[in-house]
Amino acid sequence: VVAAGTDSGPNYAHILGIHKDQIVQELGWDEDSDDDIRADIEEACGSELLDEDSDEVVDVVLLWWRDDDGDLVDRLMDAITPLAEDGVIWVVTPKTGKPGHVLPAEIAESAPTAGLMQTSSAKLGDWTASRLVQPKSKAAGKRT
């Protein structure tokens, strides 16, 4: 018997730094969203992904985003609302050449406008993920 997640290539949750007991909210799911990425994340955190209607505080937001999905700044502002101060938003976009591809500049320009900064990116099969966080100075000001 092969353990789940060890038989089919990369562990996407590990690449994204998602681990047990983290609360992950998924935004922007559609038919083209990668079920392997979703399954790896659910297995790693030990629970199902929260949907868009959840009002829980979350550690990670997984935001599926395509070039025709609207205003990324507005969507990022919505994604920040449930995010813990040290939480992470992963903007997951189709990789270059795939339908719905988003230019990296769009994410780089939208993040600071939404009060976020991009720290890294990761390749996830046919998708590319950009890691966005709230600047430490902002988070530090909220700590007690």
Residue ranges of each PLM-predicted region?
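S-adenosyl-L-methionine-dependent methyltransferase catalytic core, i.e., the SAM/SAH-binding region
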Residues: 1-144
